[in-house]
Every structure is written in C-alpha cells, then in structure tokens.
UniProtKB/Swiss-Prot annotation:
<keyword id="KW-0479">Metal-binding</keyword>
<dbReference type="InterPro" id="IPR011992">
    <property type="entry name" value="EF-hand-dom_pair"/>
</dbReference>
<dbReference type="InterPro" id="IPR018247">
    <property type="entry name" value="EF_Hand_1_Ca_BS"/>
</dbReference>
<dbReference type="InterPro" id="IPR002048">
    <property type="entry name" value="EF_hand_dom"/>
</dbReference>
<dbReference type="GO" id="GO:0000287">
    <property type="term" value="F:magnesium ion binding"/>
</dbReference>
<keyword id="KW-0106">Calcium</keyword>
<comment type="function">
    <text>Acts a an auxiliary subunit of the sensory mechanoelectrical transduction (MET) channel in hair cells. Plays a role in regulating hair cell MET channel localization and function.</text>
</comment>
<dbReference type="Pfam" id="PF13499">
    <property type="entry name" value="EF-hand_7"/>
</dbReference>
<protein>
    <recommendedName>
        <fullName>Calcium and integrin-binding family member 3</fullName>
    </recommendedName>
</protein>
<feature type="binding site">
    <location>
        <position position="116"/>
    </location>
    <ligand>
        <name>Ca(2+) 1</name>
    </ligand>
</feature>
<feature type="binding site">
    <location>
        <position position="127"/>
    </location>
    <ligand>
        <name>Ca(2+) 1</name>
    </ligand>
</feature>
<feature type="binding site">
    <location>
        <position position="161"/>
    </location>
    <ligand>
        <name>Ca(2+) 2</name>
    </ligand>
</feature>
<feature type="domain" description="EF-hand 3">
    <location>
        <begin position="144"/>
        <end position="179"/>
    </location>
</feature>
<feature type="binding site">
    <location>
        <position position="118"/>
    </location>
    <ligand>
        <name>Ca(2+) 1</name>
    </ligand>
</feature>
<feature type="binding site">
    <location>
        <position position="168"/>
    </location>
    <ligand>
        <name>Ca(2+) 2</name>
    </ligand>
</feature>
<feature type="binding site">
    <location>
        <position position="159"/>
    </location>
    <ligand>
        <name>Ca(2+) 2</name>
    </ligand>
</feature>
<dbReference type="InterPro" id="IPR051433">
    <property type="entry name" value="CIBP"/>
</dbReference>
C-alpha cells in the first residue's frame, strides 16, 4: 500500500484524454512505450512536465515505424521543431492521429503534411516523386515515377495549377476507401 508511483497528475491525464482519442489506460501504455525508448532520458514522474525529447533515431527504430518508408517524415511532421525529436505530447499526438479512432479529415490533413516534403503547403510534382519513390522503395525507373506523378496530378489537381492543395488531396482521399485502414498505427 502506498507504493504506487504517480506518473501524471489527475489534471494532466484529463488533458491528454481531452486532446487525444485515448483512454487513460491507453495513455499510460503509450507513456511507458515512450519511456522505454529512452529510460535514461525520460523520467517516470511527469507531474512536473519535464522538457524531454526522445531523439529521432530512437523514434524511427520503433517496431511501429521502423519498416515504414515515411518514418522520418512522420517524425518530422509530428515533432514541434520538425527535426523528428519528440516530446511526450508529440508522441501522443502521432499515435492519436494514426489511431483507428481518428477521423478521416484529420488523417488526411496529416497525410498531406507528410507527403508535402518541401513544406510549402502544396504537393507538387517533386513531392509526388519523393512519395512514389518511397512507396515503391526505389523500384521504379525515373520515367515510371514521372508517369505516375503525371497521372496523379491529371486525376487529382482540381484547379489545374500543377500541384495539389489540401482540398485537392482530401477529394482524392475520399475516393480511396482503404485510406483509413492503411493510415494507422496499432498500439
């Protein structure tokens, strides 16, 4: 009795529940996953809101991400500085957006950010080339990649400006019934 370690205050747990799609139990499970990545760095007591970031090298090596060709972009998009190093809040946000409970429009927004490699708020031909190359793990020739990108732009570029806006991307995602089932990470 009395030996129970307090990881979060009641208010912290409520706040995490309010801004994620997780239960208290899932939040605790994710905290321990985060802590296990860097036990020497991440304290078991978060009641004082420590300023801790787990390096990308550890985030990218997690079983949920290590085989994903977009692991670096995912980490960059969810990290506050864009460097892939994650605070606990970033880590919970990433898992929340990638959870099965997250709505399609939220997933589409983050997928768009992940595929926008040059961070200009559009997916241009270069961004598409990076995306196709990662998806095929370099298995297509430059000509084949270019052809795929051209077809995507022909199909999805609603205003014909040679790039995809978030709205263009969301309209394209609406026509992809398997998007929700593929854009997730199980916890």
């Amino acid at each position: 009795m009395g030996n129970k370690q307090t990881v979060f205050t009641h208010e912290q747990l409520e706040a995490y529940q309010d801004c994620t799609f997780f239960t208290r139990k899932e939040i605790m499970r994710l905290f321990y996953r985060y802590q296990d990545l860097a036990p020497q760095l991440v304290p078991l007591d978060y009641t004082t809101c420590p300023d801790v970031k787990v390096p990308y090298e550890l985030i990218g090596s997690m079983p949920e991400l290590k085989d994903n060709p977009f692991r670096q972009r995912i980490a960059q998009v969810f990290s506050e500085d864009g460097d892939g190093h994650m605070t606990l809040d970033n880590f919970l946000d990433m898992f929340s957006v990638m959870s099965e409970m997250a709505p399609r429009d939220l997933k589409a927004y983050y997928a768009f950010k992940i595929y926008d490699f040059n961070n200009d708020d559009y997916i241009c031909a270069w961004d598409l080339e990076q995306t196709v190359t990662k998806l095929t793990r370099g298995g297509l020739s430059a000509e084949e990649v270019s052809l795929v990108c051209e077809k995507v732009l022909d199909e999805a570029d609603g205003d014909h400006d040679g790039r995809l806006s978030l709205e263009d991307f969301q309209n394209m995602i609406l026509r992809a019934p398997d998007f929700l089932s593929t854009f997730h990470i199980r916890i």
